[in-house]
């Protein structure tokens, strides 16, 4: 084994060991990740996918959501992505945990391999991989699985794209297309777009320098740039072919879903990255903490109107990375301007509504169905880590200019932290902090204490890095590398723990006690979780202000989409991922228009049409808090009110013609009808009586034994209509 290979083996082993130690409790199954979409969406929906497959069907259709919704065509489910299939292991919980954790290792190892292919030596590549795989942006993706699954393959995609552009070989073309194709199989659009932008820009960069390296006029660079971009286009075509199983149905689904409609600009610009987040690259807790003992202490929530917290929890990749990036600005290495251009593009997109650019894209019809601009910070962070790793490699070679520039930056930022830490001894700090973040006196107490601690830690962090850089010429190189690695690990570990807190395993594997009020056989009915719509009402504000108990409230109240984990079917729920079919959206809009009409029993008719037997509403907060003795993790925030047991399949006893959705709402809000009424856009008729003797459903089929008595009947099926449904009567197709 060569020395270089030995160093690589050691580096890979340590990277794997560090990741395993950081997430050991998740690996062993004693705890699990729970933040945000993990609890409310991914853990339950992956169970649905697993159950459908294990029952011998292809997951075309998900009966649990909104009266039925496409599954395989919706990229949110990652049906065709190979690592999703880990959920088919005998233990679902183990498979679910592994299909998240494996991407941490892929990100770490892929980044290390990319840096090594760029002639960065093992120590610098190791620290660069740590800064990426255990950095703030990448670990923020753990609760955003489609983005995590795409971003994990970004380093390997770039590795083989770069190799091909430098020395074209079919093998590298194939591997670049394959790894990009894996991103298409996941189908997360913004991450795929960022990958495409990154490799496309790199192709232009390589073409430009192909002419410059031969001292040719700039006009010779144009054909070089275009030829390389053409190769990227060919790779993209090949990658789309790899991901065609997901891309073709996804594109088809878009036309029939919420994504076919223009989003309001307020939704498109939501979660725009605030300018203040730049400071997070130096001071990781400048804006607050995502989780301390399962409580969010994010004092800059006002910078995210309507959201209260960031989409990307942190952009911090380590103080060493930031210092080396700043040093690169001063020493102006080859590729430095290219990285600055990438950063400028990335930041312009990530700032979203804070600049006129997003408004321009929106009005031009380009950015009308893409949400949350903060996602686009990935390009900048990725490029910065690559450049910083190269600068570290030069520093280890004894480049004094880089060391001095980094030393100066660290000294300046440490002095700022020191001055602020000293100001904490004066009464002005509390007033200024509260004024800056808009905090009232009652809310500022614990936050102020945290903020004071953060600035002291920032002072210590900066002091340690300053000492490391100052001691560099005075220490043996291997000792300095070990100390630098320990510093980076110590710097990033608290962030990794804070961004991904855990819950005990029984949080997911146990069942909420409220389920005891529901029948054991849950196939014949659906639930309408009305309470989930009232996030700004007083009961919701009280229940969701219970600190460390907030996610227990979600779990114990079986808030959507958690009911599907307990074999419950939902209807009239919120479309969280904006992928619901258009008839579902129209029906939900009609339900809320009906409520706004002032009708007292507004929910009765929609529940009858939807086969909903139970309606979830909030319990009064104060009596429930008293009942559990203040231990809100034991609270049952929701009570399910049992209504009439409306069937899923029935014959209408009354038919009414409507012109459109608004006419439907008007008639419901002013009239009184049978619970078996049918509203149709075709001419109405007096339907004959009919009987549904029995019905049987699988994931993709429904078989009914029905009888129409004495004439032409009208069978109502409470299932979301879709263009690919096929209906037969006695074996004969019907329109």
Give residue ranges: language-model regions.
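Extended, hydrophilic extramembrane loops/domains of integral membrane proteins
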Residues: 721-735
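Conserved luminal/periplasmic juxtamembrane motif of membrane-embedded glycan-processing enzymes
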Residues: 2-725
């Amino acid at each position: 084994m060569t020395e270089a290979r030995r160093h690589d083996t050691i580096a890979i082993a340590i990277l794997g060991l560090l990741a395993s130690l950081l997430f050991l409790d998740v690996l062993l199954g004693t705890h699990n990740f729970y933040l945000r979409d993990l609890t409310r969406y991914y853990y339950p929906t992956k169970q649905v996918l697993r159950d459908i497959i294990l029952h011998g069907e292809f997951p075309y259709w998900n009966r649990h959501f909104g009266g039925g919704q496409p599954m395989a065509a919706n990229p949110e489910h990652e049906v065709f992505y190979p690592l999703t299939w880990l959920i088919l292991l005998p233990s679902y919980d183990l498979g679910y945990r592994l299909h998240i954790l494996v991407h941490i290792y892929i990100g770490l190892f892929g980044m290390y391999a990319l840096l090594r292919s760029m002639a960065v030596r093992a120590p610098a590549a190791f620290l660069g991989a740590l800064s990426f795989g255990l950095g703030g942006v990448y670990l923020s993706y753990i609760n955003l699985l489609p983005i995590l699954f795409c971003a994990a393959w970004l380093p390997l995609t770039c590795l083989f794209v770069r190799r091909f552009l430098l020395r074209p070989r079919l093998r590298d073309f194939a591997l670049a297309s394959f790894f990009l194709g894996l991103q298409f199989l996941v189908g997360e659009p913004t991450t795929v777009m960022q990958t495409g932008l990154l490799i496309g820009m790199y192709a232009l960069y390589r073409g430009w320098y192909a002419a410059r390296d031969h001292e040719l006029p700039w006009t010779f660079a144009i054909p070089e740039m275009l030829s390389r971009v053409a190769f990227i286009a060919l790779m993209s075509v090949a990658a789309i072919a790899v991901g065609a199983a997901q891309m073709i149905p996804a594109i088809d689904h878009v036309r029939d879903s919420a994504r076919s409609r223009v989003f309001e600009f307020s939704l498109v610009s939501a979660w725009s990255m605030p300018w203040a987040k730049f400071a997070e690259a130096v001071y990781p807790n400048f804006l607050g903490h995502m989780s301390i003992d399962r409580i969010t202490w994010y004092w800059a929530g006002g910078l995210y109107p309507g959201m209260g917290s960031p989409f990307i929890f942190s952009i911090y990749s380590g103080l060493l990375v930031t210092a080396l990036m700043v040093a690169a600005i001063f020493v102006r290495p080859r590729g430095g301007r290219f990285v600055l251009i990438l950063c400028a593009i990335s930041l312009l997109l990530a700032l979203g509504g804070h600049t006129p650019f997003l408004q321009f894209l929106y009005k031009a019809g380009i950015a009308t169905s893409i949400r949350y601009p903060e996602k686009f910070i990935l390009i900048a962070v990725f490029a910065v880590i690559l450049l910083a790793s190269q600068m570290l490699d030069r520093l280890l070679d004894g480049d004094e200019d880089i060391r001095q520039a980094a030393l100066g930056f660290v000294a300046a930022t440490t002095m700022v932290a020191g001055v602020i830490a000293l100001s904490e001894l004066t009464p002005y700090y509390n007033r200024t902090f509260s004024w800056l973040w808009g905090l009232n006196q009652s809310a500022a107490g614990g936050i102020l204490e945290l903020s004071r601690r953060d600035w002291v830690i920032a002072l210590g962090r900066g002091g340690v890095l300053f000492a490391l850089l100052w001691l560099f010429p005075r220490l043996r190189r291997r000792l300095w590398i070990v100390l630098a690695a320990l510093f980076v690990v110590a710097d990033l570990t608290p962030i990794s723990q804070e961004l991904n807190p855990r819950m005990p395993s029984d949080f997911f594997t146990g069942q909420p006690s409220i389920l005891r009020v529901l029948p054991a056989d849950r196939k014949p009915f659906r639930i309408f979780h009305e309470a989930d719509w009232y996030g700004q009402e007083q009961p919701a504000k009280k229940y969701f202000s219970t600190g460390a108990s907030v996610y227990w409230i979600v779990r114990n109240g079986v808030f959507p989409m958690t009911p599907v984990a307990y074999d419950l079917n939902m209807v009239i729920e919120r479309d969280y991922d904006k992928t619901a079919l258009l008839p579902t959206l129209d029906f939900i809009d009609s339900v809320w228009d009906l409520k706004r009409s002032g009708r007292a029993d507004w929910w009765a008719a929609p529940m009858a049409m939807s086969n909903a037997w139970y309606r979830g509403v909030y319990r009064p907060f104060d009596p429930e808090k008293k009942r559990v003795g203040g231990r809100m993790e034991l609270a049952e925030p929701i009570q399910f009110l049992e209504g009439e047991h409306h069937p899923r399949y029935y014959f209408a006893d009354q038919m009414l013609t409507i012109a459109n959705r608004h006419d439907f709402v008007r008639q419901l809000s002013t009239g009184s009808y049978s619970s078996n009424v049918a509203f149709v856009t075709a001419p109405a008729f007096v339907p004959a009586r009919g009987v549904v003797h029995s019905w049987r459903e699988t994931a993709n089929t429904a078989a009914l034994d029905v009888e129409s008595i004495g004439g032409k009947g009208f069978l109502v099926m409470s299932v979301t209509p879709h263009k690919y449904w096929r209906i037969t009567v006695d074996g004969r197709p019907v329109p």
